[in-house]
Amino acid sequence: MWGPNLGGFSDTQDATAEIQAIADQVKSQLEEKENKKFPVFKAVKFRSQVVAGMNYLIKVQVDEDDFVHIRVFESLPHENKPVALTSYQTNKVRHDELTYF
């Protein structure tokens, strides 16, 4: 069982249904920034970091051999704020390491 480290990112893990749901919440934000649609948007790996909320680094498959790394912030539940895409990197491949950016 993985566990995020306070202040640091967890080890890279296989994406779960929860991580896919988080990625899905920021898909439209990425599509708007990139001015394109992603018919495939499958979370495959992730890392997490506990802060005043949760940061996620998520590797998302957007085509057969094309990946995007997204950084997402999820605020604390009582703040009632939407999940936010805070940064992203395009032109990634499956074997690219998921590191902070």
Curated annotation (Swiss-Prot):
Q: What is its main location?
A: cytoplasm
Q: Name one GO cellular component term.
A: cytosol
Q: Where in the cell is it found?
A: Cytoplasm
| Disulfide-bond pairs as recorded | none
Give the keywords, sorted.
Acetylation, Cytoplasm, Protease inhibitor, Thiol protease inhibitor
At what residues does the UniProt record annotate the site feature described as Reactive site?
Answer: G7
Protein name from the UniProt record: Stefin-C
SUPFAM superfamilies (UniProt xref)? Cystatin/monellin
Q: State the span of motif (Secondary area of contact).
A: 49-53
What organism does the UniProt record list as the source? Answer: Bos taurus (Bovine)
For this UniProt entry, the molecular function terms from Gene Ontology, in alphabetical order, are: cysteine-type endopeptidase inhibitor activity
Record keyword NADP present:
no
Which residues in this protein are found as N-acetylmethionine? Answer: M1
Q: Which family does it belong to?
A: Belongs to the cystatin family.
SMART domains in the cross-refs? CY
Record's keyword annotation contains Cytoplasm: yes
* Function according to Swiss-Prot or TrEMBL: Strong inhibitor of papain and cathepsin L but poor inhibitor of cathepsin B.
